[in-house]
Amino acid sequence: MDINNKARIHWACRRGMRELDISIMPFFEHEYDSLSDDEKRIFIRLLECDDPDLFNWLMNHGKPADAELEMMVRLIQTRNRERGPVAI
């Protein structure tokens, strides 16, 4: 997926679990443009993971074996916590 195709990335952010939508969509909407190109590629790789894995990682019930994905999970958690709740 092209890091500049925001419509397609936005669609990929829509998950099958509301809990994931609450974590991933606000991060994409508020933070994606400020990421480096490498971070955008890692974010897209994270979106390619299965929902149960994403849920577990974002809810701190484990972590990805891949260090880059782990960094992105932590970044999503940190930025979402700093920004606070947002309406989706």
UniProtKB/Swiss-Prot annotation:
Keywords for the protein's UniProt record, in alphabetical order: Chaperone, Cytoplasm
GO cellular component: cytoplasm
Keyword Metal-binding: no
Protein name per UniProt: FAD assembly factor SdhE
Quaternary data: Monomer. Can be cross-linked to FrdA and SdhA.
Protein family according to the UniProt entry: Belongs to the SdhE FAD assembly factor family.
Pfam families reported for this sequence: Sdh5
GO biological process, any: respiratory chain complex II assembly
Function text: An FAD assembly protein, which accelerates covalent attachment of the cofactor into other proteins. Plays an essential role in the assembly of succinate dehydrogenase (SDH, respiratory complex II), an enzyme complex that is a component of both the tricarboxylic acid cycle and the electron transport chain, and which couples the oxidation of succinate to fumarate with the reduction of ubiquinone (coenzyme Q) to ubiquinol. Required for flavinylation (covalent attachment of FAD) of the flavoprotein subunit SdhA of SDH.
Native source species: Escherichia coli (strain K12)
Keyword Glycoprotein carried by entry: no
Location of this chain's protein in the cell: Cytoplasm
Main location: cytoplasm
Superkingdom as given in the UniProt entry: Bacteria
